[in-house]
Amino acid sequence: MLILKGTKTVDLSKDELTEIIGQFDRVHIDLGTGDGRNIYKLAINDQNTFYIGIDPVKENLFDISKKIIKKPSKGGLSNVVFVIAAAESLPFELKNIADSISILFPWGTLLEYVIKPNRDILSNVADLAKKEAHFEFVTTYSDSYEEAEIKKRGLPLLSKAYFLSEQYKAELSNSGFRIDDVKELDNEYVKQFNSLWAKRLAFGRKRSFFRVSGHVSKH
């Protein structure tokens, strides 16, 4: 699979990945990791977990990718890697390794896959996880601010009731995700996240955010 080192993509084999993650207690995968700033912050504060950020747009990751290969005294980290891949083509090397998975503030097609559960895509995401791994999806959009995107993708209006509906829970379950909890949250909650996109949302106009969490039940 292709990973980013600085501004260059290099190949990382399954054996090489296995050797690396064997040095850590846990593995966390963040799909649609954006600029990588959020998992970089998490990796700094949790040296026992190996963080894998996945995103198809490598250019957005250059700043953080250049930082993690520096000396530790200059911000370098050994417990984070960025994989260049889209949700539609996840590397087989990542199968069955994650203790937890997150999809935070997705947009575009990834948002659509989560809100209108795409069984093929989400089943492949579930395949990245170990049995009973934890998952967290945090989403937001508003008919007051993103009406065009909602119409373009045929998205439903977001509500806690939508995520708790039997239809949504069943569709997510068919993809391998068992919902344990749904929370409606506000801008203040999002201020803890470090990506530029999250900061833009957190400090922008007032809106609701929905956190769906649970466990992977596919295996």
Curated annotation (Swiss-Prot):
Q: Which InterPro entries match?
A: NpmA (IPR056262), SAM-dependent_MTases_sf (IPR029063)
Keyword Glycoprotein appears in the UniProt entry? no
Q: Give the residues the record marks as binding S-adenosyl-L-methionine.
A: 32, 38, 55, 87-88, 104-109, 195-197
GO terms for biological process, alphabetical: methylation; response to antibiotic
What reaction(s) does this enzyme catalyze? adenosine(1408) in 16S rRNA + S-adenosyl-L-methionine = N(1)-methyladenosine(1408) in 16S rRNA + S-adenosyl-L-homocysteine + H(+)
**Mutating residue 177 to A has which effect?**
No change in kanamycin resistance. Decrease in methyltransferase activity
Documented EC number(s): 2.1.1.180
Segment forming the signal sequence: none
Mutagenesis / variant outcome for changing residue 30 to A = Loss of kanamycin resistance. Strong decrease in methyltransferase activity
Q: Name one GO molecular function term.
A: methyltransferase activity
Q: Which keywords, in A-to-Z order, does the entry hold? A: Antibiotic resistance, Methyltransferase, Plasmid, S-adenosyl-L-methionine, Transferase
Q: Any idea what job this protein has?
A: Specifically methylates the N(1) position of adenine 1408 in 16S rRNA. Confers resistance to various aminoglycosides, including kanamycin, neomycin, apramycin, ribostamycin and gentamicin. Methylates only fully assembled 30S subunits.
Q: Which family does it belong to?
A: Belongs to the methyltransferase superfamily. Kanamycin-apramycin resistance family.
Q: What is the recorded name of this protein?
A: 16S rRNA (adenine(1408)-N(1))-methyltransferase
Organism whose genome encodes this protein? Escherichia coli
Q: What are the leading ranks of the lineage?
A: Bacteria, Pseudomonadati, Pseudomonadota, Gammaproteobacteria, Enterobacterales
Gene name, Swiss-Prot/TrEMBL:
npmA
